[in-house]
């Protein structure tokens, strides 16, 4: 097994390929500014730029965490207990998708994980850690952890409100790190109406609302989205939207509709 580590400490440049570095850092900074997260970590089983190997033994980790925390994480060997890196983590399984999970659920059943999250909070990473699954059209899975500082809003309500957005953003990050380059061939499979439906779905519209906007029947919208799922090799609507976003088939939506 090999480990590729891409580190942008506190959203600053690092030693890595200039093109990948510039584009990815700009994306991560934009995501931070749009959703108000503190830090982003993305993990997937594969090598940087390889979007073809399913269940690879290799590991790529992309992060914006402070260098001081990364050093502490290493010295404490938190890797061994971090729920995102466990063999049975649900984010990488072939039979699961569209997961957005508050890691407090893991902390509630494992004291070691609770200690890890408490230590991370003490060091300024935030008090809410949300792990979000992602999968590219070839079936390669990944997981993004977004950290937030949430004080006034209930954690469950916050997660429910942000879930569609986080799933989309995790898909975009995953596609960027995997280096999927077949967007044109995938896009050519989709009809204009299928793309329209995906675009409005990304903006949080229901099937009925999309039907009204496009002046078509609701069942026609359902059919278009079902066809798009099949063409994008996705198991559900949320995953199809995230994949379309990650490949640049549709543009990233504004966040206002989730507020």
UniProtKB/Swiss-Prot annotation:
SMART domains assigned to the protein according to its UniProt record, in alphabetical order: HTH_LUXR
Residues of the DNA-binding region: 207-226
Residue segments, region C12-HSL binding: 76-179
GO molecular-function term, one example from the UniProt record: DNA binding
InterPro entries: Sig_transdc_resp-reg_C-effctor, TF_LuxR_autoind-bd_dom, TF_LuxR_autoind-bd_dom_sf, Tscrpt_reg_LuxR_C, WH-like_DNA-bd_sf
Any one Gene Ontology BP term: regulation of DNA-templated transcription
One Pfam family here: Autoind_bind
Phenotype on disruption: Cells show down-regulated expression of both virB operon and flagellar genes either during culture in bacteriological medium or during intracellular infection. They also show no flgE or fliC production between the end of the latent phase of growth and the beginning of the exponential phase. The vjbR mutant is also strongly attenuated in a mouse model of infection, probably because it is defective in intracellular survival. When cultures reach high density, cells aggregate and form clumps.
HTH luxR-type domain mapped to chain residues: 183-248
Repressor keyword on record: yes
Keywords: Activator, DNA-binding, Quorum sensing, Repressor, Transcription, Transcription regulation
Tagged with keyword Disulfide bond: no
Role summary: Transcriptional regulator involved in the global control of Brucella gene expression. Mediates the effects of the quorum sensing autoinducer C12-HSL (N-dodecanoyl-homoserine lactone) on a large and diverse number of genes, including the virB operon and the flagellar genes fliF and flgE, which are activated in the absence of C12-HSL. Regulates virulence factors as well as several membrane structures. Implicated in the control of outer membrane composition. Plays a role in the expression of genes involved in the EPS synthesis and/or export.
Note: As bacterial aggregation is one of the initial steps of biofilm formation, the clumping phenotype observed in the vjbR mutant suggests that B.melitensis might be able to form biofilms.
Name listed for the protein in its UniProt record: HTH-type quorum sensing-dependent transcriptional regulator VjbR
UniProt lineage: Bacteria, Pseudomonadati, Pseudomonadota, Alphaproteobacteria, Hyphomicrobiales
